[in-house]
A protein has these predicted regions:
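Right-handed parallel beta-helix/beta-solenoid
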Residues: 1-23
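Flexible, charged surface loops at secondary-structure boundaries
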Residues: 25-28, 50-51, 97, 390, ...
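N-terminal extracellular ligand-recognition/capping segment immediately after the signal peptide
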Residues: 8, 18, 26-56, 60-72, ...
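Extracellular beta-strand/beta-solenoid scaffold signature
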Residues: 42-47, 69-94, 111-120, 134-142, ...
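Right-handed parallel beta-helix
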Residues: 58-63, 99-110, 125-135, 146-161, ...
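Amphipathic alpha-helical repeat scaffolds
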Residues: 22-25, 383
């Protein structure tokens, strides 16, 4: 192993150790070891895998800190892999010299406004384990082309400026796993994907929290932006995704360009998460084939779930709950707008206030077709439980509507306005027989 202090690094937090660390990269044996201390960098250390061969960076069990005192990433790892993950497409040099560069048990702290953590480009099997990155503009940055990225047991925390924790930017990437990590306190996004071609992105067992900017617009804990590029085949599972209110902010935001068939983004599963405390908890826009199952939603200050211009969205077994122990001017509820082939099944809507707004219900469906609302329970919601406007060929069936806390009953538990054909409302239950089931204006009356 190559101890950077053997190459002249001081690790005293004052000396510029950049030259010594670069010397260790170029002349060492490939295992770059930082013992206890604080190592100051003033420029990026480039690890060119074609030249160095297989490489690993270790911080001696987390005892070492690298402080980036200049702009750009502290470490830039560059490989030559230009193919896919198909074993037949590899050049020999990738397996012989470049595969699986590893960072483990080390802290990187930014002390420059443009400092970043680690950047990977052209790399096969980049692996991060037990890495702490703080106060960086970008924590982990993947660009151009990478394959089989793995990040586990990491802390990407307290980003600088409009920071991003993990940024997949302009990258062609297949097989990426972000597992068991804390990614928190970045003002723009915890995890962001943009201008990329990505397949197989798994985000599981993570705490992705407090990535928000109360004074800025458009931020998210997890933001998959396919308005340029395509991102498909992804999972967000067993995570806590939580923030505070931001203008236009979302906990999870997956969006594509306004294409007729919503093809740019999709084939996603969002399951078993706690998702709460933002303007919108979950925003799906111009995507298709997304499954949303077994999640707990809370404190959607504008809405819990918004589905816009989407196709083939299946959402089942989720809760929107109002816990009296929680404070905040939440609205909660769901909007489905301009979409086709949407299933809302087995939800619980508790004390949702979205129906206080004109033309809205706890669940509002607008200008959509082939929507099924079934097996849901609506308790103590303000106004209508289900508002249908310009909806065609859809079902509202087998639901329970009621007041458990008393209070004024709505004009109708289900309201249908602005026309629409082939809408059927049937087999629903009013608790205690209270209230009117259906109010229909302007169009074919639904059946009750």
């Amino acid at each position: 192993m190559s101890h950077v202090k053997d190459f002249g690094a001081r690790g005293d937090g004052r000396t510029d150790d950049t030259d010594a660390i670069e010397h260790a990269v170029q002349q060492g044996d490939g295992l770059l070891l930082f013992s206890r201390g604080e190592y100051r960098l003033t420029r990026t250390v480039v690890i060119d895998l074609e030249r160095t061969g297989r490489f690993a960076v270790s911080g001696d069990g987390g005892l070492a800190t690298v402080r980036m005192d200049g702009p750009g990433p502290a470490f830039f790892v560059r490989g030559t892999h230009g193919g896919t993950a198909d074993p037949k497409g590899f050049s020999p040099v990738v397996w012989e010299r470049e595969r699986m560069p590893t960072f483990s048990q080390i802290e990187i702290v930014g002390s420059h406004e443009e400092a970043c953590g680690i950047r990977f480009e052209g790399v096969m099997q980049a692996t991060l384990e037990g890495v702490l990155i703080r106060k960086c503009r970008t924590g982990v940055h993947l660009t151009k082309r990478n394959r089989n990225f793995l990040m586990s047991h990491c802390h990407i925390y307290d980003g600088a400026g409009a920071g991003i924790g993990v940024h997949l930017e302009g990258v062609n990437l297949h097989q990426a796993n972000i597992v068991g990590s804390h990614i928190s306190y970045h003002r723009h996004a915890g995890i962001k994907v943009e201008r990329s071609e990505i397949r197989n992105l798994q985000i599981t067992g993570c705490d992705v929290e407090y990535n928000f900017d109360p004074e800025g617009a458009d931020c998210a804990d997890i933001w998959v932006d396919t308005r340029q590029g395509t991102v498909r085949e992804g999972t967000i599972s067993s995570c806590t995704v939580q923030a505070k209110r931001s203008p236009g902010g979302a906990n999870i935001r997956i969006e594509g360009p306004d294409l007729p068939l919503s093809t740019a983004g999709g084939l996603w599963t969002i399951s078993g998460n706690v998702i709460q405390s933002q303007d919108i908890n979950l925003l799906l826009r111009s995507v298709r084939a997304v499954n949303v199952t077994g999640n707990s939603f809370c404190s959607g200050f504008q809405r819990s779930v918004v589905v816009e211009r989407c196709r083939n969205i299946a959402m089942s077994g989720n809760t929107i709950d109002y816990n009296p122990d929680y404070s905040g001017d939440r609205v909660d509820g769901m909007v489905v707008d301009g979409s086709s082939g949407v299933v809302v099944s087995g939800w619980i809507f508790e004390s949702v206030r979205a129906g206080e707004e004109e033309g809205c219900g706890a669940l509002t469906v607008r200008a959509s077709d082939a929507v099924t609302v079934s097996g849901c329970q609506f308790f103590d919601v303000a106004g209508a439980a289900v508002q249908l406007a310009g909806v065609r060929d859809s079902l509202v069936t087998g639901n329970i509507f009621g007041r458990r806390k008393g209070g004024e009953l709505p004009e109708g538990w289900v309201r249908s306005v602005d026309g629409g054909k082939g809408v059927r409302v049937s087999g629903n239950l009013r608790m205690g027989g209270e209230g009117t089931m259906v109010v229909s204006r302007g169009g074919a009356a639904p059946e009750d």
